[in-house]
């Protein structure tokens, strides 16, 4: 299994329940795909470097996980179709 790190930015209009629901949804994508979530770090609301879709701030969430090489592709697909995600990035921590 490879180690990965993903950072995603949620829409700032989400309330606490909406944030938790989205984080749990993405964690379940990882665990249902055979991965293992190691750490979830909620950075909170921060100002964006530039405006994205008429939004100046977002809620940053950092997740470290282990999985096989196919899971990041599925997670990327889920991020792309989610309306609550402003931006996302998935990187491999080791080869």
From Swiss-Prot:
The keyword Plastid does not apply. This is Small ribosomal subunit protein bS6. InterPro entries: Ribosomal_bS6 (IPR000529), Ribosomal_bS6_sf (IPR035980), Ribosomal_S6_plastid/chlpt (IPR020814), Transl_elong_EF1B/ribsomal_bS6 (IPR014717). GO terms for biological process: translation. It holds the Pfam family Ribosomal_S6. PANTHER family: MITOCHONDRIAL 28S RIBOSOMAL PROTEIN S6 (PTHR21011), SMALL RIBOSOMAL SUBUNIT PROTEIN BS6M (PTHR21011:SF1). Belongs to the bacterial ribosomal protein bS6 family. The lineage of its organism: Bacteria, Bacillati, Bacillota, Clostridia, Eubacteriales. The keyword RNA-binding applies. NCBIfam families: S6. Keywords: Ribonucleoprotein, Ribosomal protein, RNA-binding, rRNA-binding. Binds together with bS18 to 16S ribosomal RNA. GO terms for molecular function: small ribosomal subunit rRNA binding; structural constituent of ribosome. One of its GO terms (cellular component) is ribonucleoprotein complex. Coiled coil: none annotated. It comes from Clostridium acetobutylicum (strain ATCC 824 / DSM 792 / JCM 1419 / IAM 19013 / LMG 5710 / NBRC 13948 / NRRL B-527 / VKM B-1787 / 2291 / W).
């Amino acid at each position: 299994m490879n180690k990965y790190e993903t950072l995603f930015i949620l829409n700032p209009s989400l309330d606490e329940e909406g944030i938790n629901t989205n984080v749990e949804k993405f964690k379940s994508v990882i665990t249902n795909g055979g991965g293992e979530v190691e750490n979830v770090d909620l950075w909170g609301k921060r100002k964006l470097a530039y405006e994205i879709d008429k939004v100046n701030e977002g809620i940053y969430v950092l997740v470290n996980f282990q999985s096989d090489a196919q899971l990041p592709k599925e997670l990327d697909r889920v991020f792309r179709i989610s309306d609550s995600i402003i931006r996302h990035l998935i990187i491999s921590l080791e080869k």
